[in-house]
């Protein structure tokens, strides 16, 4: 039977989502637990492949499990054996044709930066404390959020986002649709939320780095148009580190 599950995880100590030999991954941990439960090899399909160090609040996955356990019992069993930094939030029976990645209609990611005066001791694993090389030359650490939001406006819609793709050998289509980008600052935390139909490798992190360059005056908001048109990774800004990124939701 095909089961759909929603998963939260702290990606700090994992080499990303996708199973890899000899290193810990989220998918690998899940498959190992379900193999133990069913005494069979199990393949789990995630809605996306988050990079090493990236976190998720609402990753969706599916897998065929040969078991007599109820969904609630599957959830309880898995959470008992999974490490404390991975949690299955819910399990439901899905249609035989449901596939977490192929059926996904949209994703919401959030990137969090810290621009306050005090070290965010308890959030440091989930927040990028902006270093001096990002904020250098500005009178304070607070970026021009209005300029960043204006720049984000050029990204809304369907575009070729090759300039914002971390894989320069990408042969598949790099066209994606972004529905909305919101940027807000509160009590020293700068949060950028990206809602789209899908995202390329490192895309959200490169968008974040580029928007920060606008916020700190290294690029103009209007430059986004030329960056998109260039289809050249070198035109965009730096790739923000993974630990500030969180997958919030997958839409179906």
Question: Which residue ranges define each predicted feature?
Answer:
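Structured-RNA-binding interfaces characteristic of tRNA pseudouridine synthases
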Residues: 1-252
